[in-house]
Amino acid sequence: MKDLPDRRLLLVHAHPDDESINNGATMARYAAEGAQVTLVTCTLGEEGEVIPPALAHLTPDRDDALGPYRVGELAAAMKELGVTDHRFLGGPGRYRDSGMMGGEQNHRAGAFWAADLDEAAGHLVAVVREVRPQVLVTYDPDGGYGHPDHIQAHRVAVRAAELAADPAFRPELGTPWEIAKVYWNRVPRPVAEEGFARLRLALPGTRFAKSAAVDDVPGVVDESVITTEIDGTPFAAAKAAAMRAHATQVEVDGPWFALSNELAQPLFTTEYYELVRGERGSPRETDLFEGVAP
């Protein structure tokens, strides 16, 4: 087995752009500190909408060119964050973006939402046993906001964490490995409320006409739920640049951004988490690896 860095972080996301919006500052920080940062993206995001008019030819109802284009956007975003280890679950295009909940895309051939759970988890087990992460970051059971691919990414990540530690599960995938800490992406409600209060004052000077609402932000929870706070302020520019790299999906204007709905949101540079498995390193962690042995 090759030598591994002392700290190893695995993030599991549904589509290209989710990682930069949710964890961009965290990823940039740990990459800069020399930790192994591995991102697994479950689909190519083929069903996303397209913001720039100049790229309208990529819309999903045309030649199915959006997914491959977003692969390039993701590569550019990873360069901005300093992350060199990125994989697609099962390989690029193995699982397809399922579209929004209730749509016909949920059940089309290859849709991630319709994937066999243990088969999909097996692809992730291979990654876990290879890179041996101490920390896993993914979504909560609702996927943050109910998107089928986000929910499925949560299910696959949690199942893979279980199976990777089981010696009886597919020994050909490598030596069993137990992940020490599992986190869900979160945003504390007071932080979101303060961010939107600032946004409402600043909105007339932005390129956006309207603001989203606090509850439009995935993963908003009461402050008491938060266990971990990662100050990504030194990496704010890297996070913003990574989000800009996802130009089909995200529009950034200073400390604000919008998705294809054109509703402005705050761009958070401090990122928050809920520890759901493993020992908390301190009452309010400031490092995902607190209490973790190399």
Swiss-Prot record:
<dbReference type="InterPro" id="IPR003737">
    <property type="entry name" value="GlcNAc_PI_deacetylase-related"/>
</dbReference>
<dbReference type="GO" id="GO:0035595">
    <property type="term" value="F:N-acetylglucosaminylinositol deacetylase activity"/>
</dbReference>
<comment type="function">
    <text>Catalyzes the deacetylation of 1D-myo-inositol 2-acetamido-2-deoxy-alpha-D-glucopyranoside (GlcNAc-Ins) in the mycothiol biosynthesis pathway.</text>
</comment>
<dbReference type="GO" id="GO:0008270">
    <property type="term" value="F:zinc ion binding"/>
</dbReference>
<dbReference type="GO" id="GO:0010125">
    <property type="term" value="P:mycothiol biosynthetic process"/>
</dbReference>
<keyword id="KW-0378">Hydrolase</keyword>
<dbReference type="Pfam" id="PF02585">
    <property type="entry name" value="PIG-L"/>
</dbReference>
<comment type="similarity">
    <text>Belongs to the MshB deacetylase family.</text>
</comment>
<feature type="binding site">
    <location>
        <position position="150"/>
    </location>
    <ligand>
        <name>Zn(2+)</name>
    </ligand>
</feature>
<feature type="binding site">
    <location>
        <position position="18"/>
    </location>
    <ligand>
        <name>Zn(2+)</name>
    </ligand>
</feature>
<dbReference type="InterPro" id="IPR024078">
    <property type="entry name" value="LmbE-like_dom_sf"/>
</dbReference>
<keyword id="KW-0862">Zinc</keyword>
<protein>
    <recommendedName>
        <fullName>1D-myo-inositol 2-acetamido-2-deoxy-alpha-D-glucopyranoside deacetylase</fullName>
        <ecNumber>3.5.1.103</ecNumber>
    </recommendedName>
</protein>
<keyword id="KW-0479">Metal-binding</keyword>
<feature type="binding site">
    <location>
        <position position="15"/>
    </location>
    <ligand>
        <name>Zn(2+)</name>
    </ligand>
</feature>
<dbReference type="InterPro" id="IPR017810">
    <property type="entry name" value="Mycothiol_biosynthesis_MshB"/>
</dbReference>
